């Protein structure tokens, strides 16, 4: 038996990127990285929807609205930036956003990747946005495309 494995291909794949605006210089890099990766893998501009929300907390709600009203996407990439502060606010938001995105992925049986940076400081966040390492938005898009491809194979074998 041959194992099923998806390939990162964007041709004929409809994807949404939901990105937060808070910490916009870094968040913008994540969204741009996801967008560039979509095009690098053959995506058509008309098959990509980009939605910007005020902060990371709003990401799950925006994804749910997109999926509930259109149902036209093969995958979603969630992009945002959370920087740890001196209060517990960071932990509450990070946990809530991660749980919300995960729950939506399961509820809609759809690949939704978590490209939300959770970092102890701005320097670490910049590193995860592609300054000293991979851009988390780009890697999230590649994963989303691989999973969309895999989902198209499941049940056809």
UniProtKB/Swiss-Prot annotation:
Any one annotated GO CC term: riboflavin synthase complex
KW Hydrolase (keyword) present: no
Catalyzed reactions: (2S)-2-hydroxy-3-oxobutyl phosphate + 5-amino-6-(D-ribitylamino)uracil = 6,7-dimethyl-8-(1-D-ribityl)lumazine + phosphate + 2 H2O + H(+)
Keyword Ribonucleoprotein: no
Binding-site list for 5-amino-6-(D-ribitylamino)uracil: 22, 56-58, 81-83, 114
Sites where the protein binds (2S)-2-hydroxy-3-oxobutyl phosphate: 86-87, 128
Top enzyme class: transferase
Keywords per UniProt: Riboflavin biosynthesis, Transferase
Family: Belongs to the DMRL synthase family.
Main function: Catalyzes the formation of 6,7-dimethyl-8-ribityllumazine by condensation of 5-amino-6-(D-ribitylamino)uracil with 3,4-dihydroxy-2-butanone 4-phosphate. This is the penultimate step in the biosynthesis of riboflavin.
Protein name: 6,7-dimethyl-8-ribityllumazine synthase
Gene name linked to the record: ribH
């Amino acid at each position: 038996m041959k194992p099923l494995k998806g390939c990162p291909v964007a041709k004929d794949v409809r994807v949404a990127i939901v990105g937060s605006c808070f910490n916009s210089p870094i968040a913008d890099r994540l969204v741009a990285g996801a967008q560039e990766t979509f095009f690098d893998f053959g995506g058509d501009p008309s098959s990509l929807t980009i939605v910007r929300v005020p902060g990371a907390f709003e990401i799950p709600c925006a994804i749910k609205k997109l999926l509930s009203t259109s149902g036209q996407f093969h995958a979603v990439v969630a992009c945002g930036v959370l920087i740890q502060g001196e209060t517990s606010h960071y932990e509450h938001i990070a946990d809530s956003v991660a749980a919300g995105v995960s729950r939506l992925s399961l509820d809609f049986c759809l690949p939704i990747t978590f490209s939300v940076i959770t970092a102890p400081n701005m320097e670490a966040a910049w590193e995860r946005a592609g300054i000293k390492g991979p851009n988390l938005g780009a890697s999230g898009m590649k994963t989303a495309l691989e999973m969309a491809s895999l989902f198209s194979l499941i049940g056809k074998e």
